[in-house]
Amino acid sequence: SFGASAVLGVIGVVSLSKAKTKPQKLFGTIPLLFSIQQLTEGLLWISLRNTDMSNWLPFLTYTFLVFAMAVWPFWIPFTIHKLETDEKRKRLTKVFAWIGAFVAIGVCFILFSYPVKAVTPFCLNCPDAATASLRDHLHYEFAIPTLVKNLIVAFSVLYIAATIVTPFISTIKKMKWLGVVFLASYLFAVIFYTGFVISVWCFFAAILSFVVLWIILDLRKTVPKNTKGT
């Protein structure tokens, strides 16, 4: 987590330095936000293993989950909407930004209404372990009633629509690769890391920071000099 945070921080600084317009700069904050998110989970690991930092557990847990579950469904479509120039697609991406905002508000309400804790559970049936062994990934346990769990499922569908579908809608060259990376990382986490999807998906999804920089570098070629900062 700390290594990823450092790399993502550098990518974020480079992305912002290369961005020419305000929409590009908003888009360029994605790697920095991922950097903060991974730093938070790194500190969460330490607080789980160090009793002196146990008081930080709730703050770090909720901070990570707000990033993972509430920030991205809004920020991804919102920044893509700001970058979009085609009027029809711009209106459509705006709809997904509003969907993301709805998800973010709903998820935050649930997060702060019910207890949640980060754990490193023992795995009894993992293929690489004949006996119980401690997993290298964090699992987040939510103490929520069945009805709310159903809402979480609904929010998950909208989350995927906001973060994965929006990049495919954009007319911006290479933006679809953002959706491809998001989708691939999600499927990878669901298939190979059941029970650790939130933690693992966010770790692998951070790879899209390289795609963000790639897109910004490509957008620089199409921005006239007199539009810098607009």
Model features per residue range: what roles?
Residues 16-28, 81-95, 168-175, 222-223:
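Membrane-interface helix-boundary motifs at transmembrane edges
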